[in-house]
C-alpha cells in the first residue's frame, strides 16, 4: 500500500494507493458509523463498482444513498449537477453529509463542485477510477463544470477529505482511456521531473500492460509531484499553473470539436506538442526534446497533432478565454527542458499559430 499526504494545514488529506481498497471500510475514512453519504457515479461504472462500495460503507454503519449520472464529458454541466442537488434535497441530506465521487474526472470535478456548493459546502471523498483522475484531477481541490464557451469555467477550489485509489479499477478501463491518462503522466515528467520522464521512456510498455508494481510507482510519483505543487500554490497564483502544460491548446480542441469527441488526455497530448513547438520557435527548447515527447506520446497510443479539420486560427478564440489570460495577455505553459517549464506571457500570436502549423504539418 502506498500512502501520502497533501499538506494544507487543517485541510490536509491522505491519498491511499493499493489494489483491493474497495473491500476495506477503513479506506473510506473519515466516514464512520452513523454518518450519511451520497455516492455519485455514472451509468458505465455503476454496474461495476456501485454495489461493492455501497456494501462496504453499509457494513461500516454508514447510511448510503446514490445518484447515477449519464457518462461523458458533455454531461459535465450545471444541468446535470442539479440532478445531484435534487437527490440530496429529496432524501434529505444535511450539512453533515459526505459526497463520494466514484468515477473519473467528470464525476470527480462535478461532485466536488456540488460538494462545494451544497448548503455552502459539505465534505467529499474522491474515489478516482480512471488513470487520468488517479494521477491528476482527484488531487488538489479543483472542481468545476463546463460551459459551452469554455471548459471548467464554472467551479471552485474545494479540497476532498480523502483520495482512494484502487488499482483494480484500471483492469476495466478501455485502452483509449488508459492512454488518455498517460498523457497527464507524461506531462509531469516534462514540466517537473526529467528523471521520471526517463523512467517513463523505459517503462511505458509495463504501464500499458498494467504491471501493478510499475503502475503503483507511477501513480504515487505523479501524486507526490502534484501534492508538492498544490501545497506550495493551492489557488494557482503561480507554480500550480505549470500543471496546465498542453491544456490551453487542448481545451481549445475539446471545445471546438465538441466535449467528449476528443478525450481530455488526447487533447492535452496534442497540446503538449504544440507547446513544445512554441517554445522551440522562441529559442528556448531543443528540437530533439520535442521529438522525445512526440516519441513517448506515440508509444503511449496518443495523438501528436490536433484535428486535421481544425484550422490554426480556430484555436485562438478558445485560447483567449483560458483562465490564465490576464488583461488580454495569453499566458502559456512552455517547456524549457525535459523536467523544467515556465508560465510565459507576451507570446506573439503569430508564434502560436506557427507552432500549431508546425505540429500539424510535421512528419512525425
From Swiss-Prot:
Pathway assigned in UniProt: Metabolic intermediate biosynthesis; chorismate biosynthesis; chorismate from D-erythrose 4-phosphate and phosphoenolpyruvate: step 2/7
Record field: catalytic activity: 7-phospho-2-dehydro-3-deoxy-D-arabino-heptonate = 3-dehydroquinate + phosphate
GO biological process entries: amino acid biosynthetic process; aromatic amino acid family biosynthetic process; chorismate biosynthetic process
One term of GO molecular function: 3-dehydroquinate synthase activity
Residues annotated for Zn(2+) binding in this entry: 184, 247, 264
Function, as annotated: Catalyzes the conversion of 3-deoxy-D-arabino-heptulosonate 7-phosphate (DAHP) to dehydroquinate (DHQ).
HAMAP family linked: DHQ_synthase
Entry protein name: 3-dehydroquinate synthase
Organism: Klebsiella pneumoniae (strain 342)
Organism classification: Bacteria, Pseudomonadati, Pseudomonadota, Gammaproteobacteria, Enterobacterales
Amino acid at each position: 500500500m502506498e500512502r501520502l499526504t497533501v499538506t494544507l494545514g487543517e485541510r490536509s488529506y491522505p491519498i491511499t494507493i493499493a489494489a483491493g481498497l474497495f473491500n476495506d471500510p477503513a479506506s473510506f475514512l473519515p466516514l464512520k458509523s452513523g454518518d450519511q453519504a451520497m455516492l455519485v457515479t455514472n451509468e458505465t461504472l455503476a454496474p461495476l463498482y456501485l454495489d461493492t462500495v455501497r456494501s462496504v460503507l453499509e457494513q461500516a454503519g454508514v447510511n448510503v444513498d446514490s445518484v447515477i449520472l449519464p457518462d461523458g464529458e458533455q454531461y459535465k454541466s450545471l444541468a446535470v449537477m442539479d440532478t445531484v442537488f435534487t437527490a440530496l434535497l429529496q432524501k434529505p441530506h444535511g450539512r453533515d453529509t459526505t459526497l463520494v465521487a466514484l468515477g473519473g474526472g467528470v464525476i470527480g470535478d462535478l461532485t466536488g463542485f456540488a460538494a462545494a456548493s451544497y448548503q455552502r459546502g459539505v465534505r467529499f471523498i474522491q474515489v478516482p477510477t480512471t488513470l487520468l483522475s488517479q494521477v491528476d484531477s482527484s488531487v488538489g481541490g479543483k472542481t468545476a463544470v463546463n460551459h459551452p464557451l469554455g471548459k471548467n469555467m464554472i467551479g471552485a477550489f474545494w479540497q476532498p477529505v480523502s483520495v482512494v485509489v484502487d488499482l483494480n479499477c484500471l483492469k476495466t478501463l478501455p485502452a483509449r482511456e488508459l492512454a488518455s491518462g498517460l498523457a497527464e503522466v507524461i506531462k509531469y515528467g516534462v514540466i517537473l521531473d526529467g528523471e521520471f520522464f526517463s523512467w517513463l521512456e523505459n517503462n511505458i510498455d509495463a504501464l500499458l500492460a498494467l504491471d501493478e508494481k510499475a503502475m503503483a510507482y507511477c501513480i504515487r510519483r505523479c501524486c507526490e509531484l502534484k501534492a508538492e505543487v498544490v501545497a506550495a500554490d493551492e489557488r494557482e497564483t503561480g507554480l500550480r499553473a505549470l500543471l496546465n502544460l498542453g491544456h490551453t491548446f487542448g481545451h481549445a480542441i475539446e471545445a471546438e470539436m465538441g466535449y467528449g469527441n476528443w478525450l481530455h488526455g488526447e487533447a492535452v497530448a496534442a497540446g503538449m506538442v504544440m507547446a513544445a513547438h512554441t517554445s522551440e520557435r522562441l529559442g528556448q527548447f531543443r528540437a530533439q526534446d520535442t521529438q522525445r515527447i512526440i516519441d513517448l506520446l506515440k508509444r503511449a497510443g496518443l495523438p501528436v497533432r490536433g484535428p486535421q479539420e481544425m484550422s490554426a486560427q480556430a484555436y485562438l478564440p478558445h485560447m483567449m478565454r483560458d483562465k490564465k489570460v490576464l488583461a488580454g495577455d495569453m499566458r502559456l505553459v512552455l517547456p524549457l527542458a525535459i523536467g523544467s517549464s515556465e508560465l510565459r506571457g507576451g507570446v506573439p500570436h503569430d508564434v502560436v499559430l506557427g507552432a500549431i502549423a508546425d505540429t500539424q504539418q510535421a512528419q512525425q
